[in-house]
Every structure is written in structure tokens, then in C-alpha cells.
């Protein structure tokens, strides 16, 4: 489930300007040669983070998912959850958020979870879903707290089947998460949107990457 075309196009443009979305030749962790790269760590100043929070908030509100709070898995998810709840508050919806520590504390407030009490319907927020490990850990922590995971919110759905360069799985990581946990995955943008953006772009240098992206999707995409 991706955001509407306007929000998606604006986000893709924003990611390109921030050099978070790049085109060229990049080797993925799975050993595949990808014609594009998405690195959410490039949203690294106040203005970019503020804008990013608004894109996440808009995608979440447009999804019509019912939720009570956000949860950001360490480490990237912490900043994303904070930015998004600020954007939601600016839009008139004040919701709590929480996150986890990588290692439990045995002093002070202790425990693994930090922030608001984890309860009600919880949206997990992250940048992308690669192997789904972060989501599985988050679902486990949320359920152990007695709350209900209700959706996963990400920036980009690569729409790419799992596996390696040689061994290609039947499903994408997003599809696997949706099937395993019965949770909808909401994305601000997806690969279909990126390809549509390239197709419509008046920037020849940018649109020249479309054949490589299409070939990559034909080989590894869903």
C-alpha cells in the first residue's frame, strides 16, 4: 500500500534532492547489482527530518489505518518515529511513541522499551524492509507488552524478491511480513512510483536510468 501519487512524487523528488535516492550501480547486501540506492541516513539535518516526518505522517493518515501510537525500532526507527509524531501533532493529532534499546538496562527506568507505555494499536515505523528481522523483533516486543501491532510504515518499498543474485525468492520482504503477521505495510513510495517518476521526468540524465531500473525489476521484482 503506497501513498497517493502526489505525496509519492513529491517524496521521490525530495529524496533525490537530498541524495538519499541515487542512481548508478550499487552492490546490495544480497550481492545484487542494483541501478539505484536508497539511504535514509541522508535525511540528516533539521529541515530534511522535519519534511520527512510530514511525508510519513501524510502517508499514514491517507491509509486510514486506526492506530493509537507509533513504535520505532532502534536505531533508525527512533528518529523516524519522533519526526512523525511531531508532524502528526502539527497536523492536530497528538499521539505517543516508544522505541526499544538494543540492550536492556538494569538501572534507572530499566527494561528494553523507552518512551510512552506500549498499548493499544501500534504502528511500527522504519525506513525500508530488507530481511524483515526488525519487524519480527518489533512485533514480538509489542505483543509481549500486551499491545497490538496494526501496521508497518516505511519510506520505500523496493518491490524486490528476497534472496541473492543467484537465488531469487518467490516473495518480497514486504509480502513476507504481510503474510507472516497479517499486517498491512504502508510505504510513502515504491518502485512502481520511482519508475513512473523517471518516465515522466524532463531530466534526460535521470530518465536515462529507466531501462536499467526496468531490467532490474524484470529480474528481481514482484
From Swiss-Prot:
Provide the catalytic activity annotation: orotidine 5'-phosphate + diphosphate = orotate + 5-phospho-alpha-D-ribose 1-diphosphate
Q: Which cofactor does it need?
A: Mg(2+)
Q: Which Gene3D superfamilies match?
A: 3.40.50.2020
Q: Which GO terms describe its biological process?
A: 'de novo' pyrimidine nucleobase biosynthetic process; 'de novo' UMP biosynthetic process; pyrimidine ribonucleoside biosynthetic process
Kindly state the subunit structure of this protein. Homodimer.
Protein name, UniProt field:
Orotate phosphoribosyltransferase
**UniProt binding sites for orotate:** 37-38, 130, 158
User: Any keyword Ribonucleoprotein?
Assistant: no
Species whose genome carries this gene = Polynucleobacter asymbioticus (strain DSM 18221 / CIP 109841 / QLW-P1DMWA-1)
Keywords (alphabetical) are:
Glycosyltransferase, Magnesium, Pyrimidine biosynthesis, Transferase
Query: What InterPro entries is this protein classified in?
Result: OPRT, Or_phspho_trans_dom, PRibTrfase_dom, PRTase-like
Pathway of this protein? Pyrimidine metabolism; UMP biosynthesis via de novo pathway; UMP from orotate: step 1/2
Q: Which GO terms describe its cellular component?
A: cytoplasm
What EC number(s) are associated with this protein in UniProt?
A: 2.4.2.10
CDD domains for this protein: PRTases_typeI (cd06223)
Example of a GO MF term = magnesium ion binding
Which residues are involved in binding 5-phospho-alpha-D-ribose 1-diphosphate?
29, 75-76, 101-102, 105, 107, 126-134
General function of this protein: Catalyzes the transfer of a ribosyl phosphate group from 5-phosphoribose 1-diphosphate to orotate, leading to the formation of orotidine monophosphate (OMP).
HAMAP family this protein is in?
PyrE
* Family, per entry: Belongs to the purine/pyrimidine phosphoribosyltransferase family. PyrE subfamily.
Pfam families of this UniProt entry? Pribosyltran
